[in-house]
Every structure is written in structure tokens, then in C-alpha cells.
């Protein structure tokens, strides 16, 4: 089975599911392929990774750190220069791998795994499940700062901001490089009255507007109750905030 990860025209975007895409600066890598063994008899199992560059270069290597389940959910984080690939794990933190050889450059150690990853110029923002947002030095993996949150993940909005349910029933727009909140909403405000629904898509539409969508399961055999809301975010209206 091959899992292909393509990159968007404007951003280097790696896809798990469409609703969980992650945004990165346009970069050197064009495509990543994961080839999983047909028979898996042990865990963790080796995955063959093919990294294709826009220059035409292509490298193939094997690793046990890049888990397909995570790729499907959260994508593959890479640096814009194409030198590093970041591998999330369920229990053992975050790995930084050489994109051309698969060699381990550094890893973080924690009791919780890592879900989303946002790659900046000299830092990485990652989420430790439902514990904290962490800023890491991109060269060493050293923790620069962290902020406690209750959610299991975040959504990248553009080159600068993320959206996160930082506390129960409280959504925040956070500047990735500083972990500072620039806009805060109650769950009712953020979903425009659908606070008991599950939010599964947040997109920045430009001009300070967010598109928020979600659903609520129905237990009577009927289709899910779905909603879509347009939410104003004045803090993202300025040209600088557009990223």
C-alpha cells in the first residue's frame, strides 16, 4: 500500500485527511510516499519512505519512526529547505529525521505523544496530545517554551496563526511563534450556537474571516446534524497577519 502526500501550489501542505491538513511554507520537497509492508507481524514496523524533490532528486530510506496512522491523521511535517522530516509518535514524542537518509537528528522524550506539528523558520510548534503546546528549537529539539491546553490538536490557519480549543469550551487564535492568544471565543461564539457539535474543519478565508464546520451524531438513524459558520477574527485582518 502506498500513501502519497502531495504539496499544494501555495504552501507545502501535507495531508492526513482533508479536515486535518497542516500548512507549511512552500518548500523544496514535492512529494512523499510511504510504502507499508503487506504483512505486519511486529510493532513498530518498518516503512519505506520515498522523498521526491522539485529539483528532480529522489531519496529512499526505511524507518520505524514514521507511522502511517499518524500520517493519515496529521500529515508529514517538513522544513521548507527540504532537509528535515518530522515524525510524530503515540508515546515517545517527536523525531527529527534527515530527509535524504532517514537518519535521526534529534528526538524529544515525553510521556505523551505528539499530534499536530507547525514548522516555522527557526522553531517548531507541536502539540503533546491533551497536555500542552510546545515551542521547540528546530536545530536541537530543545523546548523553548510551552503552554498548557486541553485539546488534542490544533488547526494551522496560515503562516502565522493556529486555532486551538485551549480550554474546555474556549477556542483561541494563537500566534505560533510566541504562543500568545490574539483572539478568544466561547464555544457558542465560535460555532454560532452549535457549541454541542464536534468541530471538524476550520479554514481561514481571508479578510479576517474563519469558516468553522462541524457535526453532531444522530442516534435515530438519521443523517448527522451538520453546521457551517463564518466567524470574524479582527486580529487577522491586517496585511501582516495574513502571513
Positions of PLM-derived features:
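Blade-level signature of beta-propeller repeat domains, shared across WD40, Kelch, NHL, RCC1
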Residues: 200-243
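Repeated scaffold domains used in trafficking and secretory/extracellular systems
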Residues: 2-29, 35, 68-80, 110-121, ...
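Aromatic (tryptophan-biased) beta-strands that constitute blades/sheets of beta-rich domains
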Residues: 2-11, 15, 19, 33, ...
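Structural recognition of the beta-propeller blade-terminating site
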Residues: 53, 98, 137, 175, ...
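Short loop/turn segments that connect beta-strands within the blades of beta-propeller domains
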Residues: 17, 25, 45, 81, ...
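Short glycine/acidic-enriched loop and turn motifs that connect beta-strands
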Residues: 20-21, 39, 169-170, 216-221
Amino acid at each position: 500500500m502506498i500513501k502519497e502526500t502531495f504539496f499544494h501550489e501555495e504552501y507545502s501542505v501535507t495531508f492526513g485527511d482533508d479536515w486535518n491538513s497542516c500548512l507549511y511554507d512552500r518548500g523544496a520537497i514535492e512529494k512523499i510516499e510511504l510504502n507499508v509492508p503487506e504483512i505486519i507481524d511486529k510493532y513498530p514496523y518498518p516503512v519505506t519512505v520515498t522523498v521526491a524533490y522539485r529539483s528532480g532528486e529522489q531519496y529512499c530510506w526505511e524507518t520505524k519512526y514514521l507511522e502511517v496512522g499518524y500520517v493519515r491523521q496529521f500529515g508529514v511535517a517538513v522544513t521548507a529547505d527540504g532537509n528535515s522530516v518530522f515524525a510524530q509518535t503515540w508515546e515517545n514524542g517527536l523525531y527529527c529525521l534527515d530527509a535524504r537518509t532517514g537518519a535521526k537528528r534529534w528526538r524529544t522524550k515525553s510521556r505523551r505523544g505528539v499530534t499536530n506539528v507547525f514548522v516555522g523558520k527557526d522553531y517548531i510548534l507541536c502539540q503533546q496530545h491533551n497536555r500542552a503546546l510546545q515551542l521547540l528549537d528546530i536545530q536541537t529539539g530543545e523546548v523553548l517554551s510551552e503552554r498548557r491546553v486541553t485539546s488534542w490538536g490544533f488547526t494551522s490557519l496560515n503562516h502565522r496563526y493556529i486555532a486551538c480549543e485551549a480550554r474546555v469550551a474556549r477556542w483561541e487564535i494563537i500566534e505560533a511563534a510566541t504562543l500568545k492568544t490574539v483572539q478568544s471565543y466561547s464555544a457558542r461564539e465560535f460555532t454560532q450556537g452549535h457549541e454541542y457539535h464536534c468541530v471538524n474543519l476550520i479554514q481561514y478565508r481571508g479578510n479576517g474571516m474563519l469558516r468553522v464546520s462541524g457535526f453532531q451524531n444522530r442516534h435515530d438513524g438519521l443523517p448527522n446534524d451538520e453546521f457551517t459558520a463564518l466567524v470574524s477574527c479582527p486580529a487577522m485582518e491586517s496585511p501582516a497577519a495574513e502571513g
